From Swiss-Prot:
Record-given protein name: tRNA sulfurtransferase
Species per Swiss-Prot/TrEMBL record: Pseudomonas putida (strain ATCC 47054 / DSM 6125 / CFBP 8728 / NCIMB 11950 / KT2440)
Keyword rRNA processing among record annotations: no
Annotated pathway: Cofactor biosynthesis; thiamine diphosphate biosynthesis
Keywords tagged on the record: ATP-binding, Cytoplasm, Disulfide bond, Nucleotide-binding, Redox-active center, RNA-binding, Thiamine biosynthesis, Transferase, tRNA-binding
Lineage: Bacteria, Pseudomonadati, Pseudomonadota, Gammaproteobacteria, Pseudomonadales
GO cellular component: cytosol
Pfam entry (one): ThiI
Length: 484
C-alpha cells in the first residue's frame, strides 16, 4: 500500500529551512506512530507531501494504519494510490480502466488530473482524452463535471502516474515536536479533554496535570482519558501525567477562606501549582478548558483575578465556545463517554460564589491561607510517563492477568460498543458479557459476587485500569483477560 500524505497548508508557506524541519518532523512522527505495525515502513518526503509505503498486505493492519494517520497532527489529508511509470495517454486510459472500469457502466463520471513537472500536455488534455476513452470503452452513461456519480482521480508528477483509490482526511495542524510544549489542567470532563485535543491538533506537545481533590476513582478516570487522548492523537511523542494531591489544599480553603471566594481561590492555587510544574519542565504556557461565564468562576473579572496568580501564559482554547459545541466535539474525538461517567469530587462548593472578585479582597482571603500546605502538595506530586500510567497502577495492587478463560468464568468485554459490533468477542464454552468501559464501575456492583470475571479490551490498557479500580473497591473476583 502506498499513501501520499499532504501536509498542513500553513507549513508550505514557511521559509524553506522551517518547512524542511516541519516535514522532517512529520515523517519521524509517522514512523513512530506506525512502527509497531510495520517496522520496515518507508517514509520519504518532498516540499509539500510525504510518501508512505508499506509492504504489509493484511487489510486489517492497513485499516489500522489509515486510522492512525487520520489522527496524526500535521496531515491535511492523504491519498491511497497505485503508482506506475508515466506512459502515453492510451496507457493512462488502460490504467484507469483497470481500476475504475467496473464502476463506470451506466454511470455519469468525471476525470480529475492534477499534474506537476514539465510535460508537453496540460491536465485538461488528460481529463478530456481519458474521459472520452473511458466513456466509449466502459459503457458509461456520460460525463458529469459538477456532480459525478464516479470520480476518476489521477496525479502526474514528473514521470510517475498515480491512480487515486481513496482520500482520507486528517486533523491538520503542525507536527508534534515541531512547536513548543504546554501543560493542560485536566479534570477529565468535556471541557478539559477538548481543550487538550485542540492543543494537540494544533501541534503542541501537551502534558497532563491533574489536581486530585480527594478521589482515587477520579484520578484513575483522568489517567484513563489522558492515556486515550495521547494514544489516539499524540503517541508520536512521550509526555507526562502529573498527579498532585490537593486534599489538604481543599481543606485549608474550606477552613480559612470566605465561602464566596472559595472557587476562585481554588483555581488560583491550581494555577500556581501548574505553573510550578511547568517551570520544572521548562514549559511556557498552561491550558485550561474554561469558557466565558460557563460557571461562576469563569466570568471575565474572575478569570482576570485567577490569571494574576501566575506570570505564565494561560491559554483557553474554548473561551468563546458554546457548551453544546464542546460536547459535540468531545463526542467526535471519543472523550464524551469518558466525561459522562467521570467520577466527580465537589469538595469546594460556594453557596453564593462571587462573580466579580475584587483584587484587594482576594489578597485578604489568601493571607488567611497557609502556603506551606500548597508547597507540601507540590512536593508530593507524581510524575508518570503517560505510556507507563498502567504500570504505575500495579505498584499498590497486584493485577492478575490470564491468557485463557476457564469454564464458569465470565469474560466482560469492556470495549466501546462500536468495537464490540465490528469484532464481536466469541469464546467457545465461555459466557461473554458486553459492558462498555464507561459503564462498568456503576454496573459491576450488580453482578453475581460468587462468579469470577475477566475484563477484556484490545490492548489491555482499559481492562487493567478498571480491574485496578474494582480491586481497590474490594471486588476480589476480577482478573484481566489477555489472550495470546
Amino acid at each position: 500500500m502506498k499513501l501520499i500524505v499532504k501536509v498542513f497548508p500553513e507549513i508550505t508557506i514557511k521559509s524553506r529551512p522551517v518547512r524542511k524541519r516541519f516535514i522532517r518532523q512529520l515523517g519521524k512522527n509517522i514512523r513512530n506512530v506506525l512502527k509497531d505495525l510495520d517496522p520496515e515502513l518507508a517514509v520519504d518526503g518532498v516540499w509539500d507531501n510525504l510518501e508512505v509505503v508499506t509492504r504489509v498486505e493484511d487489510e486489517k493492519v492497513q485499516r489500522e494504519m489509515i486510522e492512525r494517520l487520520t489522527c496524526t497532527p500535521g496531515i491535511t489529508h492523504f491519498l491511497q494510490v497505485e503508482e506506475y511509470p508515466l506512459g502515453d495517454f492510451d496507457d493512462i486510459v488502460a490504467k484507469c480502466k483497470h481500476h475504475f472500469g467496473h464502476l463506470l457502466a451506466g454511470k455519469h463520471f468525471a476525470v480529475r488530473c492534477k499534474r506537476g513537472g514539465h510535460h508537453d500536455f496540460t491536465s485538461m488534455d488528460v481529463d478530456r482524452y481519458v474521459g472520452s476513452q473511458l466513456r466509449q470503452q466502459c459503457g458509461a452513461a456520460g460525463i458529469e463535471l459538477k456532480k459525478p456519480e464516479v470520480l476518476v482521480r489521477i496525479e502526474i508528477r514528473d514521470q510517475r502516474l498515480y491512480v487515486i483509490h481513496n482520500q482520507h482526511n486528517g486533523i491538520g495542524g503542525y507536527p508534534l515536536g515541531a512547536l513548543e510544549q504546554t501543560l493542560v489542567l485536566m479534570s477529565g470532563g468535556f471541557d478539559s479533554t477538548v481543550a487538550a485535543y485542540q492543543m494537540m491538533r494544533r501541534g503542541l506537545m501537551t502534558h497532563f496535570c491533574f489536581f486530585n481533590l480527594g478521589g482515587r476513582a477520579h484520578e484513575l478516570g483522568v489517567m484513563e482519558v489522558a492515556h486515550y487522548l495521547w494514544k489516539k492523537y499524540g503517541s508520536s511523542q512521550r509526555v507526562l501525567f502529573i498527579s498532585v494531591p490537593f486534599e489538604e489544599v481543599v481543606g485549608e480553603i474550606l477552613n480559612k477562606v470566605d465561602n464566596s471566594y472559595m472557587g476562585v481561590t481554588l483555581k488560583r492555587m491550581m494555577l500556581r501549582g501548574a505553573a510550578h510544574m511547568a517551570d520544572r519542565l521548562q514549559i511556557d504556557a498552561l491550558v485550561t478548558g474554561e469558557a466565558i461565564s460557563q460557571v461562576s468562576s469563569q466570568t471575565l473579572p474572575n478569570l482576570s483575578i485567577i490569571d494574576s496568580a501566575t506570570d505564565k501564559l494561560v491559554l483557553r482554547p474554548l473561551l468563546a465556545s458554546h457548551k453544546q459545541d464542546i460536547i459535540d466535539q468531545a463526542t467526535e474525538i471519543g472523550t464524551a463517554d469518558f466525561a459522562k461517567h467521570m467520577p466527580e469530587y465537589c469538595g469546594v462548593i460556594s453557596v453564593n460564589p462571587t462573580t466579580h472578585a475584587k483584587r484587594h479582597r482576594m489578597e485578604h482571603e489568601e493571607k488567611q491561607f497557609d502556603m506551606a500546605v500548597l508547597e507540601r502538595a507540590l512536593e508530593r506530586a507524581k510524575f508518570i510517563s503517560i505510556d507507563h500510567v498502567i504500570d504505575e497502577l500495579g505498584k499498590d495492587i497486584e493485577i492478575e492477568e490470564v491468557a485463557e478463560a476457564l469454564p464458569g468464568q465470565i469474560v466482560i468485554d469492556i470495549r466501546h460498543p462500536d468495537a464490540q459490533e465490528d469484532e464481536p468477542l466469541v469464546l467457545e464454552g465461555i459466557e461473554v458479557q458486553a459492558m462498555p468501559f464507561y459503564a462498568i464501575n456503576s454496573k459491576f456492583k450488580h453482578l453475581d459476587p460468587t462468579r469470577q470475571y475477566l475484563l477484556y479490551c484490545d490492548k489491555g490498557v482499559m481492562s487493567r485500569l478498571h480491574a485496578h479500580h474494582l480491586l481497590s473497591e474490594g471486588h476480589a473476583n476480577v482478573r484481566v483477560y489477555r489472550p495470546t
